[in-house]
């Protein structure tokens, strides 16, 4: 045998490696599972849980200032005025004339062909666009306290008169449209409602009862533990009439109140809060999409369906007008239903939720791995196994289910607090720049007038977005240590 220094044996090497491996990451988890070696087998070591050895970084929240937000009634009034302006410009695009020519050339001496306009259709569209404003007026009047019988009686009479007037105009215009137009044209009048009922009424995001405003903190503990395996315990089947009633009530109700956030410490409560906020956010987005498409449909598309076959209009410009109306209506409704305070609430919940990154098989084979536990708060960088896959903790505070795609999507959207605001700002800024470019290249008087009127409305929306972006950007960039906040 040649001489020389002999290294340690394989048994001695494995024995010396185990304590360092356990001390590095923390041994077994709180649910009785331990580390795993390269072959995937568990190493039975008695060690304290991982949260006792590696404390997750505490979650700190920024305090944002209270930014002014338009009230429900003020917003509905401004939104209704904007829709009326866009409806007026669409009628200009369709029924414009060359009124500056001498009288011996054209047969028209006015700027529009008023004799071709269907006033019953215009009144019908106006009533449909005013539905949210009328309901906001009634809701606002109902919330006002009345101390005398006379004021209360006047309030009831005013509500009845307003509803009767709107109902009479709606019925009168509908009857006249039935008399003067074909059945095919009349199908376009209620097309949005016909599409809304099957798409939205039967898809309620697995929820049957409205969740409390504090996102599940009033839910009993038994239901919280059942919700860890799925929120099916809170779901009860509904019939068609109940779904239809609830969906129509959502369309007419004022914007819902913003839920609260109390920085829960239990992983079950955090996941329950995320499920609640996810359902609330989906409902708000559904309302934004439907109302923006509804407004663009009745403002820019429905007048085109009732144009006579002998009437010429610029199809490309009318379609472009339709797209611009829809985009701006989408941004206006998003800024109202997704205010900065609500986006900050989603960001705080995402900070507590965390995220897991799925790794390929065979990677990090020498690193310690744990079995994921639903009752453990996992720090950043920890490797866990769940559903035969390997995941790495991305956030500083992780309680999300690794295989749950909705949790990863929620964290991606809201872990940066300005992501939604930046997206809306880019959309509105691009729209304004395109309208300015179109205004510079416009050669027809109706194009210039329509773009100028719509730009006047878009400037207000762009100003609000820029103001919120500048203020919130400064607030979120401020060091957290200067607030003197306690970690949650």
UniProtKB/Swiss-Prot annotation:
Transmembrane regions listed in the UniProt entry: 72-92, 110-130, 155-175, 182-202, 287-307, 319-339, 420-440, 446-466
Domain of life: Eukaryota
Major localization listed first in the record, in broad terms: membrane
PANTHER family: FI21814P1 (PTHR12995), TRANSMEMBRANE PROTEIN 39A (PTHR12995:SF3)
GO process annotations (BP): negative regulation of autophagosome assembly; negative regulation of autophagosome maturation
Presence of keyword Membrane: yes
Topology of the protein relative to the lipid bilayer: Multi-pass membrane protein
UniProt GO cellular component terms: endoplasmic reticulum membrane
Matches recorded under InterPro entries: Uncharacterised_TMEM39 (IPR019397)
Keywords: Glycoprotein, Membrane, Transmembrane, Transmembrane helix
Localization annotation: Membrane
Glycosylation sites: 31, 39, 180, 206
Family assignment from sequence similarity: Belongs to the TMEM39 family.
Protein name in the entry: Transmembrane protein 39A-B
